[in-house]
Amino acid sequence: MTQPLDDAASAIFGPRLELAQCYADWLGTAGVERGLLGPREVDRLWERHVLNSAVIGELLDHGERVVDIGSGAGLPALPLAIARHDLQVVLLEPMLRRVEFLQEVVTDLGLAVEVVRGRAEERSVRERLGGSDAAVSRAVAALDKLAKWSMPLLKREGRMLAIKRGASSR
């Protein structure tokens, strides 16, 4: 990392920076090997993936329940869970190989994060995860489709936070 990235990472992750580094290591090795992240992304893991995901924590209140729709390799929710360990984070992912990767990472890092295999549009998922404070996602689908998936998972005042094309939108 460059000095500005070091400073940003320290500011965002504080005493949990080492956990964030371990997650970045997972992404750069097993994440690439298992096809969850392209090999060209390794050089920009921190700037484009880890930090870009963690900063949405500024939009969440203490202790909120957050569902990551289509977690994939754990972005944005794992950096968010590392930076904001007060949050109740649920990773929602339909693909078994990704779920297995996420469970391995969560266990290895000792994170209090729930991994659920399923799709947001499934009735059982809506019943289990409905009433959440926020739904987050990163490069999952068009916003209109994402809104259809997110709304049933949210409580009345809930928020959908989507990271699209390198920028965070609310």
From Swiss-Prot:
Domain of life of the source: Bacteria
InterPro entries: rRNA_ssu_MeTfrase_G, SAM-dependent_MTases_sf
EC number: 2.1.1.-
Gene3D superfamilies: Vaccinia Virus protein VP39
UniProt subcellular location: Cytoplasm
One Pfam assignment: GidB
Keywords annotated in UniProt: Cytoplasm, Methyltransferase, rRNA processing, S-adenosyl-L-methionine, Transferase
One of the record's GO molecular function terms: rRNA (guanine-N7-)-methyltransferase activity
Keyword flag DNA damage: no
GO cellular component, one term: cytosol
Residues the entry annotates as binding S-adenosyl-L-methionine: 70, 75, 120-121, 138
Positions of disulphide bridges: none
Function, in words: Specifically methylates the N7 position of guanine in position 518 of 16S rRNA.
Family recorded in the similarity comment: Belongs to the methyltransferase superfamily. RNA methyltransferase RsmG family.
Protein name: Ribosomal RNA small subunit methyltransferase G
Gene: rsmG
